[in-house]
């Protein structure tokens, strides 16, 4: 697959991208390098991995990171219940050593995302989502796996990759990532989309929604994001939800009343709702609200 073919595949997925993003994805894929994507929550980092899986016709294997994540949840664990049952059934077995060996065979091994991705016969897209939420110890373990594409399980031995996954790591920058991890990866930073890109996303994902309404929603979201009072900036997914909600109500014009009724699809906490009300009281200047004043 060349760069133009990759772009065509992404177009088929109705994914809006720029040349830089497409080029970085293509080169990382060709070199077999993991790709680290940073950016604020909701800018579409996870979507990149989903689109690549669809474009490459590969399975998407996702590891959602969180504080306290360890190898047993990310790599593998043993099916203790099944092992216990087997021990009970074979209580009178003569060859205890053989029984012990069998208990630590594939039959009792539960694959978690990392092991699944390297044992897969066909290459997968491995999404390691929000790596910044995991601790530094897990990051160091992950670095070893990404460097060697193999893993050692004490009871089994070293398992080498059957295929090399295309690895996408995302980070909201909750904590700094190690320089060692950064060196290992290609890097991409994704900003919130500008007005033109957001409108293109709305048109691509919601082609049935009135074009004028899409433009008003895109402009309103741009203004909400640039408003310093708003604590939680609307994500792209929330932009799409909002436009879909307005459309479901048969609304074709983003009036102050429509904005008030549907704000819960784009603003997700009480403080931001209150800030929106305060802005409206002074005359809302979002999207289709220009010129509307009410007290």
Feature-to-residue mapping (PLM):
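C-terminal regulatory/interaction module of P-loop NTP-utilizing enzymes
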Residues: 1-295
């Amino acid at each position: 697959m060349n760069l133009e073919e990759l772009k065509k595949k992404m177009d088929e997925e109705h994914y809006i991208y720029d040349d830089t993003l497409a080029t970085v994805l293509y080169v990382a894929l060709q070199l077999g390098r993991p790709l680290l994507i940073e950016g604020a929550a909701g800018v579409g980092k996870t979507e990149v991995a989903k689109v690549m899986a669809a474009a490459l016709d590969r399975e998407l294997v996702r590891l959602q990171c969180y504080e306290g994540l360890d190898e047993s949840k990310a790599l593998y664990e043993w099916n203790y219940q099944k092992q216990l049952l087997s021990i009970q059934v074979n209580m009178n077995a003569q060859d205890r050593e053989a029984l012990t060996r069998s208990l630590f065979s594939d039959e009792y091994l539960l694959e978690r995302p990392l092991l699944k991705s390297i044992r897969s016969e066909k290459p997968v897209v491995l999404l390691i989502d929000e790596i910044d939420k995991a601790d530094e110890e897990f990051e160091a373990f992950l670095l070893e796996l990404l460097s060697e594409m193999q893993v050692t399980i004490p009871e089994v031995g070293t398992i080498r990759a059957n295929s090399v996954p295309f690895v996408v790591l995302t980070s909201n920058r909750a904590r700094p990532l190690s320089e060692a991890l950064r060196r290992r990866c290609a890097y991409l930073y994704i900003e919130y989309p500008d007005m033109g890109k957001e409108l293109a996303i709305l048109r691509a994902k919601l082609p049935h929604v009135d074009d004028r309404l899409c433009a008003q929603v895109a402009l309103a979201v741009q203004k909400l994001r640039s408003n310093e009072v708003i604590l939680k900036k609307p994500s792209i997914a929330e932009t799409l939800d909002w436009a879909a909600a307005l459309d479901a109500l048969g609304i074709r014009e983003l009036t102050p009343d429509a904005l008030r009724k549907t704000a819960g699809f784009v603003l997700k906490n009480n403080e931001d709702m209150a800030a929106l009300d305060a802005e409206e009281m002074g005359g809302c200047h979002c999207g289709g609200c220009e010129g509307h004043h009410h007290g």
